[in-house]
Design a protein with these regions (language model features):
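Periplasmic/extracellular loop-to-transmembrane helix junction in inner-membrane transport proteins
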Residues: 2-3, 29-73, 210
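N-terminal signal-anchor transmembrane alpha helix
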Residues: 7-29
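Transmembrane-helix boundary motif in ABC transporter permease subunits
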Residues: 67-97
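Generic hydrophobic transmembrane alpha-helix motif, especially the helices
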Residues: 98-134, 141-142
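Transmembrane alpha-helices
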Residues: 125-129, 162-195
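Short cytoplasmic-facing helical segments at TM-TM junctions of multi-pass membrane proteins
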Residues: 138-177, 212
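Hydrophobic alpha-helical transmembrane segments of polytopic membrane proteins
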Residues: 207-244
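Short cytosolic juxtamembrane segments of multi-pass membrane proteins
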Residues: 246-263
Length: 263
């Protein structure tokens, strides 16, 4: 008898297998050319043949993604701490964080690439801009969500601001921070890919976005789909790893993680 946990893994795999089978059948029965829509088997063959070059490019994109995520976590967390310490500072600077978030990165990436001469750093800045806001926003909310009764109790016992931050505000904000981190993981990958599209540079330090552009120009559509598959798989792995980290950190004391463990 398959339990709920088994179905959580099995059901998506069955749906995916059914989708791929229908896709393969449709391409073969309708004789669709591979430069319009390749069959999954053609994509798998391209992934096998072009695997070394695609994986090398994926490593470049992944390096930018992880660096941007780490920078977003550190800088975003620090900004949230500053906001929690000063309401005036939050009211003054938070609107500009919103502006950065809602401005399409594809519109400002060319300027960043021009202003920042070092290519890796320019791509890192673009990915960071996309990734940092969920961490700032969520962590700020978490730091400001400490229970008022507990805050009053800390004041009653003469706790210093540092003690209140360490023993009350930070534990309260941790689930919010981890939720923002899960969101930012995917956004960092998106930002890195968009920045690579705009930069459009080849060479040894070529990211996966350039491989997609190159495949599109050459009508190597199976290779394009193979690169897209690697990007999607990378995004899923990043999310699952961050979700696992969140559950590991919270499972012994936070209700959300404890409830998930019991299911």
């Amino acid at each position: 008898m398959i339990g709920e946990r088994g179905w959580r893994l099995l059901a998506p795999l069955l749906i995916g297998a059914l989708f791929l089978a229908l896709w393969e059948a449709a391409v073969r029965l309708r004789d669709i050319p591979p430069y319009i829509l390749p069959a999954p088997s053609a994509v798998a063959l391209s992934l096998w043949n072009d695997g070394p070059s695609l994986l090398g490019s994926l490593f470049v994109t992944l390096r930018i993604t992880l660096a941007a995520l780490a920078a977003a976590a550190l800088i975003g967390g620090a900004i949230a701490l500053l906001f929690s310490r000063s309401r005036i500072l939050e009211l003054s600077l938070f609107p500009y964080a919103v502006i950065l978030q809602v401005t399409p990165i594809v519109a400002i990436a060319p300027l960043i690439i021009i202003w920042v001469q070092q290519p890796f750093l320019a791509l890192l800045v673009c990915a960071w801009i996309v990734a940092f806001f969920p961490i700032v926003s969520n962590t700020t909310v978490g730091l400001n969500s400490a229970d008022r009764n507990l805050l009053a109790l800390f004041r009653l016992y003469g706790a210093s601001p540092g003690q209140t931050l360490l023993y009350l505000r930070l534990p309260t904000a941790l689930p919010y921070f981890l939720a923002g981190l899960r969101i930012s993981g995917g956004l960092a990958l998106i930002g890195a890919v968009v920045a690579e599209f705009v930069a459009g540079t080849g060479g040894a330090e070529t990211g996966l976005a350039f491989r997609i552009l190159e495949a599109g120009y050459r009508l190597a559509i199976p290779r394009l789909f193979a690169a897209l598959f690697l990007l999607s798989l990378t995004g899923i792995v990043i999310y699952l790893l961050l979700d696992w980290l969140s559950r590991r950190v919270l499972r012994h004391w936070h209700e959300s993680a404890a409830a998930a463990e019991e299911e």
